[in-house]
């Protein structure tokens, strides 16, 4: 028989993936995409910001990178951004805000460990959001300096 814990984890993941698809289909999400499409400033900074915000909104790094590359990649390549640099920035940026409390990995790990968000989210936030965003800032700096 299928263990209860595993079916619960599977349901958590399915629910959060479904959440990402629902978010993507809303007017508010389209407004976010429109706003992010008009970010000015350095292309790498605006692309990194857009990618990580999309990942945060969908609660998914893979969803964030997929949407960002589909919507923004050609625009930034047309501005002269090296495609390899763009990809590296996207790969880091999609992990910046993807582990907010509604992320399926966070929910599943906490459920598997029998912990609550209140008990355990702070160290998750520090290691997976704060440190990743610091790394993203460094990668953007290097991309600007050497692009």
Question: Language model features by range: what are they?
Answer:
Residues 31-42, 85, 91-101:
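Structural signature of hydrophobic alpha-helical transmembrane segments
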Residues 31, 62-75, 104-115:
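Re-entrant/interfacial helical elements at transmembrane boundaries that shape
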Residues 1-7:
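Short, small-residue-biased leader/transition segments that mark boundaries at the very start
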Residues 94-147:
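Juxtamembrane and boundary regions of transmembrane helices in multi-pass small-molecule transporters
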């Amino acid at each position: 028989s299928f263990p209860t814990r595993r079916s619960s984890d599977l349901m958590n993941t399915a629910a959060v993936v479904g959440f990402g698809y629902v978010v993507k289909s809303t007017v508010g999400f389209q407004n976010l995409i429109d706003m992010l499409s008009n970010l000015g400033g350095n292309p790498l900074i605006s692309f990194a910001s857009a990618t990580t915000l999309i990942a945060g909104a969908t609660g998914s790094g893979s969803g964030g990178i997929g949407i960002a590359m589909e919507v923004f990649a050609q625009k930034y390549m047309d501005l002269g951004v090296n495609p390899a640099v763009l990809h590296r920035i996207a790969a880091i940026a999609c992990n910046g805000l993807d582990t907010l409390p509604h992320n399926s990995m966070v929910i599943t790990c906490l459920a598997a460990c029998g912990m609550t968000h209140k008990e355990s989210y702070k160290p998750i936030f520090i290691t997976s959001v704060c440190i990743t965003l610091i790394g993203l800032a460094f990668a953007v700096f290097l991309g600007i300096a050497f692009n």
